[in-house]
């Protein structure tokens, strides 16, 4: 999925305005100006469109974890330099403190049926033989299911 779309969909789901989005970024020591955010939230075909980098999205997701679960002791988590759908999926799951059964229920709201074993493969280490790459379809379904759950 495109990082800008993920940010836009999550922000809409939680009814975050521009100031709140900037505040979530700041929770992970990432400063985004209002002008930058305006360009990031524009549609792809807009000439002022600016691509959200993996580091920026990782910072937002780390900030979302702090926003939803509170700050933990120790140093702030450094944002990943490269993101995969698996990492994004896991960070959203952590931010919302969702257990496997809850994630499965959220996916079912979006019309995607997965078993616990299948789901756990997305959260394994990339070097694990049972690791499974998360597709755009699965991540999109998860975000769609969350929107249904949280806006119902």
Annotate the PLM regions:
Residues 6-11, 18-25, 54-64, 88-93, ...:
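Short, structured motif recognition centered on aromatic/hydrophobic residues
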Residues 12-14, 33, 96:
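Helix-boundary capping/turn motifs
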Residues 39-75:
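N-terminal flexible/basic segments that precede or flank functional cores
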Residues 1-8, 17-52, 112-136:
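A cross-kingdom feature marking solvent-exposed beta-strand/loop segments within repeated
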Residues 8-9, 31, 60, 74-76:
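Short, flexible segments with low predicted structural confidence
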Residues 62-113:
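Short, solvent-exposed interaction modules
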